[in-house]
Amino acid sequence: VFMRDFEYAKDKVLMGKERRSLILSDEEKRITAYHEGGHALVAKLLPGTDPVHKVTIIPRGRALGVTMQLPEGDRHGYSKAFLQNNLMVLLAGRVAEEIIFDTITTGAGNDIERATGMARKMVCEWGMSDVVGPMTIGEQGEEVFIGRDWGHARNYSEDTARIVDAEIKKLVETARENCHKLLQENINLLHALAKALLDRETITGDDIDLLVKGEPLPPFDADGSAAKQEPAAPAPASADAEGETFKLEAEPSQDGGTGEKTQDETKQQ
C-alpha cells in the first residue's frame, strides 16, 4: 500500500468517483479549465479562505470539474468577511467564463444555488445585513401531516420580504463584482492555471502556489501528478561496488488520475 492509494481513496470519498468514460469536447474541457481555474485562483488570492487542496477537470460524480478546498483545522464559527470571500469563490467559475468566453453556461448552476443559499442565511439567520439587522426572518414551523418541510411560519410582512430579497441580491452581486475585478487584475494567472489544467488535468495546491509565484511546475507522471524522486540509496557493500547509487522513481497511479473538490463543483445541469 502506497500513499497514492490513500490519496486515491480520499479523493473518491470527497469528490466522487472519476468518470473517464464521459468524453468532453475540447471546447468543454477549455470552459471547465477556466471555470475551475477561476475558483482556485480566487480562493488562493483572497485572505482567510480555506486552502486549495486539489483542482481537476476530470469529471467526477455529476461534476465536470472540481476544486477542493480543505480547512487547516476545525472551524466552529464563521465571520462575515469569511462568508463574503466564500461567496466570491463560489461565483468565480461563472465570472471566469464571462471574462474569457463572453458567455455563461449551465456549469455554474450548483455554485449559484450554494451562493444564494449562503447569502440567504447571512440575511435571514445570522443577522449580517445592515438593513435587516439582527433578526431571524422566516422561522421553520412545526411538522405537518403531509410533509416535514412544508410548514413555514410567516413572521414577516411583504415589505420585509422585499427588503430581504434585495439584501440577498446585493450580497451576491457585490461578491460577483469584486470577483470580476480580482480576476481581471490577475488574468495572466487565470490563463496559467487553465493551461496547467488542460495539460495535466489535475493540479495540487502546491502547483497553484508555484504558478502564482511565476515558477515552472515540476515534471509530472502519466497520471498527472508531480514526479518525485526519493533520496539516493547508499551503494551496496560489495567488493566491486564503484559508488553506484539507486533512486526510487515515483510509481504511476493505478487509477490514471488523482482529481479532487468547495465543494465548489461544476455541475452538469
Regions found by a protein language model. Give the residues of each.
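Soluble catalytic regions of large protease machineries
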Residues: 29-34, 40-269
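C-terminal helical "lid" subdomain and adjoining coupling/linker elements of P-loop NTPases
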Residues: 1-6, 12-31, 125-134
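Active-site micro-motifs of SAM-dependent methyltransferase domains
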Residues: 8, 39
